[in-house]
Swiss-Prot record:
<dbReference type="Pfam" id="PF02931">
    <property type="entry name" value="Neur_chan_LBD"/>
</dbReference>
<keyword id="KW-0407">Ion channel</keyword>
<dbReference type="InterPro" id="IPR006201">
    <property type="entry name" value="Neur_channel"/>
</dbReference>
<dbReference type="GO" id="GO:0045202">
    <property type="term" value="C:synapse"/>
</dbReference>
<dbReference type="GO" id="GO:0007399">
    <property type="term" value="P:nervous system development"/>
</dbReference>
<keyword id="KW-1015">Disulfide bond</keyword>
<dbReference type="GO" id="GO:0045211">
    <property type="term" value="C:postsynaptic membrane"/>
</dbReference>
<dbReference type="GO" id="GO:0043005">
    <property type="term" value="C:neuron projection"/>
</dbReference>
<keyword id="KW-1133">Transmembrane helix</keyword>
<feature type="transmembrane region" description="Helical">
    <location>
        <begin position="241"/>
        <end position="256"/>
    </location>
</feature>
<keyword id="KW-0675">Receptor</keyword>
<feature type="disulfide bond">
    <location>
        <begin position="149"/>
        <end position="163"/>
    </location>
</feature>
<feature type="transmembrane region" description="Helical">
    <location>
        <begin position="465"/>
        <end position="483"/>
    </location>
</feature>
<dbReference type="InterPro" id="IPR036734">
    <property type="entry name" value="Neur_chan_lig-bd_sf"/>
</dbReference>
<keyword id="KW-1071">Ligand-gated ion channel</keyword>
<dbReference type="GO" id="GO:0005794">
    <property type="term" value="C:Golgi apparatus"/>
</dbReference>
<feature type="topological domain" description="Extracellular">
    <location>
        <begin position="484"/>
        <end position="495"/>
    </location>
</feature>
Amino acid sequence: MARRSRLRRLLLLLLLPVASTSDAEHRLFERLFEDYNEIIRPVANVSDPVIIQFEVSMSQLVKVDEVNQIMETNLWLKQIWNDYKLKWNPSDYDGAEFMRVPAEKIWKPDIVLYNNAVGDFQVDDKTKALLKYTGEVTWIPPAIFKSSCKIDVTYFPFDYQNCTMKFGSWSYDKAKIDLVLIGSSMNLKDYWESGEWAIIKAPGYKHDIKYNCCEEIYPDITYSLYIRRLPLFYTINLIIPCLLISFLTVLVFYLPSDCGEKVTLCISVLLSLTVFLLVITETIPSTSLVIPLIGEYLLFTMIFVTLSIVITVFVLNVHYRTPTTHTMPAWVKTIFLNLLPRVMFMTRPASNEGNTQRPRPFYSAELSNLNCFSRIESKVCKEGYPCQDGLCGYCHHRRAKISNFSANLTRSSSSESVDAVLSLSALSPEIKEAIQSVKYIAENMKAQNEAKEIQDDWKYVAMVIDRIFLWVFILVCILGTAGLFLQPLMTRDDA
């Protein structure tokens, strides 16, 4: 029992200061708000303004909506003013120098975000305010604002944006409330880094503006938020694939025409770029004022690919030309077979005709054996009796005639030689018919060779055109890409 009694006394001694402090705060609260009116400005003289010290702390840049041109931020609005009705002597209340009270119990300035786009213009007053015995009131309510911001997508995704946030009293003019900026810029000490945007700077400015509606002057504090987009996401997922696809267009002119896939490759590249363009349109603002940089590049690449399709169709038309459908002009031979190949460092393989000896004429090779052939055939004489080793007069006369004629054939042309051979009365009708067939085959093969040479010339002309546009498209692709994506850097240096 004695032990329990001692414990009770000890607990009473420990709780006595707490009860005393709680009682002091209760008495202080009752005294401060006994006759307090939260609607009346806390000034002793009605002509005196309430000086509001104002500062914005950025907690998080939640999102920048380019389509709707809205910037969503999480801010802390620090507001400090003096309320002469909320002063007390700490010694009368157990040394209490600070007191936290609900914000709806005290007078607060009606500071709103002027350029608010969605949601409430004013912050919620459910947080508590800190009171100091000197009458100083500190209120730091958190708020999520969706402010309107004019997004300039000219250099998207390498763009910089300047979004302003204008704070001020909605109903009190400068004679009633005057704003004083704490510091020279937005407080970023507690800022949570964004994965898409980097804040370059956020200076603050105070303005005293006279609006058309009223004669009074209204003060405001405006923060200019300079932000830079982090382009890594768009570079990896949009720009690099577009670059690779656009460079595939160059390979169209290196692809041989005989493979039959040149037009297919062009159309596949065009369809891929169309899909990328549909993706881009969902991420940029729906505005007709400017075309974003990535949109310009896609448009440039689509024109690039469309021209490659037109040129490829023309090249295929040239490639498959034949002597029966087209005649090659002399200027085409001069320019595309002689001049341009040297300029483009193209070397055409030498013809086989210059590297091999001309085959012996038919008459010098095979007709030289007519003597042997005549000996075999002349085993039967004209009279129908067998010849004894070709010693009869008729066979001797026939052999001599063929030998003399074969000697003369070596000095004449092939067609003339064949005609001369056919004129020999010594040859049998079967031999003449065989030689006539050989003559027809030779002339047909000669015509086919000439036609093939002309077709090869047309194919070489198509190859030269392909090589020209290969280098042209490489230069245009490199220069166009560099010219477009270096614009943000050049503009930034000029600024």
